[in-house]
Amino acid sequence: MVYYNHKAIENKWQKFWEDNHTFKTGTASSKPKFYALDMFPYPSGAGLHVGHPEGYTATDILSRFKRAQGYNVLHPMGWDAFGLPAEQYAMDTGHDPADFTAQNIATFKRQIKSLGFSYDWDREINTTDPNYYKWTQWIFTKLYEKGLAYEAEVPVNWVEELGTAIANEEVLPDGTSERGGYPVVRKPMRQWMLKITAYAERLLEDLEDLDWPESIKDMQRNWIGKSTGANVTFKVKDTDEEFTVFTTRPDTLFGATYAVLAPEHDLVDIITTAGQAQAVADYKHQASLKSDLARTDLAKEKTGVWTGAYAINPVNGKEIPIWIADYVLASYGTGAIMAVPAHDERDWEFAKQFNLDIIPVLEGGNVAEAAYTDDGLHINSGFLNGLDKAAAIDKMVTWLETEGVGNKKVTYRLRDWLFSRQRYWGEPIPIIHWEDGTSTALPENELPLVLPVTKDIKPSGTGESPLANLTDWLEVTREDGVKGRRETNTMPQWAGSSWYFLRYIDPHNDQKLADEDLLKQWLPVDVYVGGAEHAVLHLLYARFWHKFLYDLGVVPTKEPFQKLFNQGMILGTSYRDHRGALVATDKVEKRDGSFFNIETDEELEQAPAKMSKSLKNVVNPDDVVEQYGADTLRVYEMFMGPLDASIAWSEEGLEGSRKFLDRVYRLITTKEIAAKNNGHLDKVYNEVVKTVTEHLEAMRFNTAISQLMIFVNAANKEEQLFLDYAKGFIQLLAPFAPHLAEELWQFLTQSGQSITYVAWPSYDESKLVEDEIEIVLQIKGKVRAKVVVSKDSSREDLEKIALANDKIQAEVAGKDIVKVIAVPNKLVNIVIK
């Protein structure tokens, strides 16, 4: 049996591609363009696992396919290399995070190159390179100039163990940090914010024009959270104070029986009575220990404290008590709500807990038993009585505006983006704070502001970053003698990844972010492949920065990514005991087809689970490439199932993919290759070309591979293989298994040239038409035989063929034939006595 030597072939062709710059991006503007982008990786110490190449293989297949179709293809790779893990490692070990990051990048790059991806490495970028982050800082200075980057004293999600504040999006539902799983507490701090809220409406509207999964668009819509309603102003009894609430249901104002302020609301300390001061102070402290997510969890027990103060309901003059409760957030809306417990579940539970009034203002339901949250005609509502929801809202908004106690309002759930981190390993923020109280951004000719090299990267202990320890770097003096201090916060990891797709277009430009003509040529990204976990972080931030750059006239498109595709997750094999607890794979042995815990001898259930180091079920692509070859890994990951499905890794599936490639190798190298076409494979070959082409366009890679298998099966049944069909088949294979395809292309052509830019095969529509067709022969409606006949045979010919058939003759012998019914291209039915 002949097998191909994957190590020799893959090493040979990877060297050829590198030596010949095979995948250098074409610049001829006469050709159509195709920009295929991967979400660039964070280069962790663990290196690649087999989940990474799934998305990378998909974009590589599309890139190779499009090159063969005559497109200029931009297919780059780089490194999202700032971030907490490298800094944490450096603090734990005393190593420089830059050195650690460089080692990790070298490992990732070696692994990625071993998989044969057709990246243009001349365009490689690294977010920690000062030549790159010069432009990250430049974008920040432009945001600052336009008032979209500002400082504010805000309650932040502080993580003591990380020594930094993190964004709302980085807090898990259990109130711990996404990175590290550490406790998160609320703490007021001076922070840099980016005014993403200024773009809320455009971020929402422009989703309609994108070819993205609807689930991702919905997640962004929900995160932006547009609400239409009204602001209502409540006066505080016996004071000059007032507060504003936003409500989507101003029509229920007659049912507002109490108000709730966030514990952090500015009014709380002003209006709290002496008798309630201690209870309020204690409650505020407890609230500060909880994350926003923990505070707003619908399932948690309702807590709160009365301030001792009352507000006046503007629509009926009634006094209503003012409470504080942690489920109201200072950062959301106005930090105050009017509570209508008859028609809101959370308000109803709170009112029941603290024995507050519940007044129904909509017909229907029994508010003594539960809140009524459906619609109904208005009751107990003065001038709104008898009106439906829409009419009542309109009438109430008109009344509020006429009386000067409210107005129509659109709000968004989206908060401004907390942009500063109290860490060392990030882009320095290019701002100087002067002793006269002013602040200035560095001019472009002073960028990049380079991150100083230091071993002293432990948190400062003051809430500032370790940069506060570096006096020589920190302190500056202006020409007029005024002293200043550099900003010590650094940018979050999201900064460099919010625009990296633009730098790939012109990565070596030291005069501007990228050349305008090149940006016009390549934008938008045609297909962006990556994980769905980035729906409301990276993807929203990148869209915001892109729209800002569009407003500046830097980029020519409103949106960065035209098509988004989320690949599924490759799951590892895991084992569970009778309690459902996961058991690490090194504690499992297989006996007689079953799996047992080595330590307890308990039989275990096998189940797929996310690959993790703790379960020891992470598959390293290096091992797969060594044993099976890169082409096998590529074909297997694409053949596992639909690209967007999450599927368990299978060694048997890997072996099956390798066997298929060995069959391809044997077919081409051992079958007689004929210069003349005998026509036997016309139909199957043309069908395969047509179908594979369609499935590649639709990113249905698993079914495209199935078609390749169909051709191999059909070709193996023939004595010889027509040369043009052999070559065409290898071209179809090339995007999936490029090393083997290059080797077999040379075997067939002896050209000495790569297959990369050979024109994609076409198919002959006329060859897809069936010349012959199978019909059934029946006696009294029951099938007795099947025969292949010429397509569109006449009734007379079909009758003759049926009566000449051996099986039919045996059945009708000695019997009278009453009639013969022939239906062209379908059947012949013989009726006998």
UniProtKB/Swiss-Prot annotation:
Q: Which GO terms describe its molecular function?
A: aminoacyl-tRNA deacylase activity; ATP binding; leucine-tRNA ligase activity
Q: What is its main location?
A: cytoplasm
Short sequence motif 'HIGH' region: positions = 41-52
Motif 'KMSKS' region, per the record, lies over 610-614
Swiss-Prot/TrEMBL catalytic activity: tRNA(Leu) + L-leucine + ATP = L-leucyl-tRNA(Leu) + AMP + diphosphate
Per UniProt, the enzyme's principal EC class comes to ligase
Q: Has the keyword rRNA-binding been applied to this entry? A: no
Q: Name one GO cellular component term.
A: cytosol
Question: Where is this gene product found?
Answer: Cytoplasm
Q: Which UniProt keywords apply?
A: Aminoacyl-tRNA synthetase, ATP-binding, Cytoplasm, Ligase, Nucleotide-binding, Protein biosynthesis
Offer one Pfam family short name for this entry. Answer: Anticodon_1
What family name appears in the similarity comment?
Answer: Belongs to the class-I aminoacyl-tRNA synthetase family.
PANTHER family reported for this sequence: LEUCINE--TRNA LIGASE, MITOCHONDRIAL, LEUCYL-TRNA SYNTHETASE
Record-given protein name: Leucine--tRNA ligase
State the species of origin: Streptococcus mutans serotype c (strain ATCC 700610 / UA159)
Gene name of the record: leuS
